[in-house]
């Protein structure tokens, strides 16, 4: 990690936004993404007892993808079509993957989900990491491919190579590095993990 670049980015950020992500100048962006409201919806829609109904879980998955500003308009209808095409067995597996991601063995859930999505050409970092991020925005990271590649290059994150196919191995290694970076800056920047990676993205412009 290039700590000098990170601290310089922090200083520049506070020069424009003295209150960090609580600064009024950033409110329009925060309102547009509405992560807090969607996060509360995800907590309710994906509560552990809801997983007794896999059909409902996959429909809720599609709903959150449609609502989210983090997913491209191009991918949203593809996810809706995927859910319509799925057999009951595939819906069960997607539901199991989401349960493991949120409540069980995260590595297994991650790989199962990537495998299911791959059958429909949708094994995308953004889609795999969306629900876990909304469910726990302080501990889980939303992974956006271009931003991720730029962060690795700009902040000199060595011994890690980005690949388009989502894997838990990369996710665990990359997010550990992000946590180390987050620990080096003010809590006014690092509370919401998408906000933190947004801060890093702004630093690279």
Put a short name on every predicted segment.
Residues 1-120, 137-205:
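An N-terminal alpha-helical hairpin/helix-loop-helix interaction module that forms a charged
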Residues 115-132:
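Helix-hairpin-helix
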